[in-house]
Amino acid sequence: MILTIGMIFTLASCGGDKTENGGQQAGGAKKIDYANMTEDDLIKEFIKDEKNITLDEFIDLVSTYSYATINNKLELDENITDKAIKKLKDNKATLPAAKEIVEPLLKSDSLQVRGYAFSNIATFFGASDSHKAAAKAILKNEKDPYVIKCAVRALGNEGGKDAEIGKFLLSAAKNENAVVRRQAAVALGSTWNKTLDGAVDAEIELMKDSDNEVRKAAYEYAGLLGDDRVVAPISEMLKNEADADLHSSGVRGLVWLWYDYPSHENTSEAAYRATIDYFKTTPGSDKVPAWAAVTSFTNKSEKNYAAWKEKATYFNTDELYEVMLGLVKNENLGRMTRGYACKPVAAHCTKEQFNAFGTVVNALTDKNAKFIQDEYQKQAAKLDE
């Protein structure tokens, strides 16, 4: 589940391309010498009493986001509005609640301010009906990639419950801006969107994207949808060493399908077999298998693991032991891949198997032997705790 928690917070994660809107004031706010001000100046300019901040005062303060610059990652560059709001929070100032500020800020002429409004829509319990209605009205005509990214992030868990928002998320997956498409890949992969018709197909299409960051997100988050249709395209990518930088994301996508930490609910044998097949890649290299893939299923929930293991009849610790042993013996592989092969054995295999694994590790003499042996000792120490 992908959640955005909180009521009043900054826009660090919701920033387009450099925009000419930086410097334009919003909502009728007075002109200020923003570039030469500090956060203290900003608070003094707009707030009379920190313990009794009015809605109008706070909206005027937030409207100064319009002076902030949006960078190519669709994030706001460092700005004093962020700092001023943080300082007010640190000072225990009484700030208006999101339910009061969202709708008026969504109507701002400033895209930075509209982005802030979207960032305040989502809570742990999801967006309210009134906020969703206001958001949908704005999004009918919204074209700016910065605002769309913020909206996708805020509404990412709503696609399976609201057809109109679902349609918006699917359209964002086709946006011309790669940053928006990446955010759509993350959002569509929310477990809340399992019932969104078209989500799986959109993720599979994003796996073919021209931008590797988009592909990486699609490979990783698609598995959260619990649909075996994503196994084949992930498996094909894992066979291509040219995509080695994407391999750990692909394996994480598979792991969601068969291991699903911490809930341990999913039991896809096809995804498990694809994972094991990847670890059997020969002859291997310093990049393949990816070291982060080896550690992608080493955490486990003491509450749910045993029940999962009973259902996951495909999960064979003897097989896992042999596969990890193959990694640690293969001198073609990177030292981290070999060293971290100790971790799945420690997490899932028997004490006897772990000890036998140590015998092999301690007999290594190649240039990476000490690193691997040190990693084994770290796992041994944890098991003895």
Enumerate the language-model features and the residues they cover.
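Sec-dependent signal peptide recognition
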Residues: 1-4
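C-terminal motif of bacterial Sec signal peptides marking the signal peptidase cleavage site
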Residues: 10-13
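Bacterial signal peptide processing site
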Residues: 15-17
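N-terminal, intrinsically disordered, polar/charged segments of Gram-positive cell-envelope systems
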Residues: 21-30
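Structural detector for internal amphipathic alpha-helices that build alpha-solenoid repeat scaffolds
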Residues: 33, 40-49, 60, 71-94, ...
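Amphipathic alpha-helical scaffolding segments comprising HEAT/armadillo-like alpha-solenoid repeats
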Residues: 39-40, 52-72, 93-107, 126-140, ...
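Terminal, low-structured helical/coil segments at or just beyond the last alpha-helical repeat
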Residues: 355-385
